[in-house]
Amino acid sequence: MTGTGTTGFEEQLARLQEIVRRLETGELPLEEGVALYKEGLELAAGCRKRLQTARNDIKVFSDGVLKDFDMPEDSPAADD
């Protein structure tokens, strides 16, 4: 599974969380750990891209005008 497949964001995020959990155990053989790490990087990039696309698509209707959604400065996602 890669971050560029047709799976949904939630499925990709769940898989990424599972990979992190498995890597954090420190009990994987080297080859499996490296493969999971690579998959995790691909999934993270895919999730990041989907979030950015969603952020760009969000519009806020204010004063009769559609405006782009601006992430609040203090939001954790605003640091991306």
Swiss-Prot record:
The record ties this protein, via InterPro entries, to:
Exonuc_VII_S, Exonuc_VII_ssu_sf
Q: What is its EC number?
A: 3.1.11.6
HAMAP family recorded: Exonuc_7_S
Similarity annotation: Belongs to the XseB family.
Name-wise, this protein is Exodeoxyribonuclease 7 small subunit
Catalytic activity as recorded in UniProt: Exonucleolytic cleavage in either 5'- to 3'- or 3'- to 5'-direction to yield nucleoside 5'-phosphates
An MF annotation (GO) of this entry: exodeoxyribonuclease VII activity
From the Swiss-Prot or TrEMBL record, state where the protein is found: Cytoplasm
What GO terms in the biological process aspect are recorded for it? DNA catabolic process
Q: Which Pfam families match?
A: Exonuc_VII_S (PF02609)
Name the source organism: Oleidesulfovibrio alaskensis (strain ATCC BAA-1058 / DSM 17464 / G20)
This chain's function reads: Bidirectionally degrades single-stranded DNA into large acid-insoluble oligonucleotides, which are then degraded further into small acid-soluble oligonucleotides.
Keywords of the record, alphabetical order, are: Cytoplasm, Exonuclease, Hydrolase, Nuclease
According to the record's subunit comment, the protein's assembly and interactions are: Heterooligomer composed of large and small subunits.
- What GO terms fall under cellular component here? cytosol; exodeoxyribonuclease VII complex
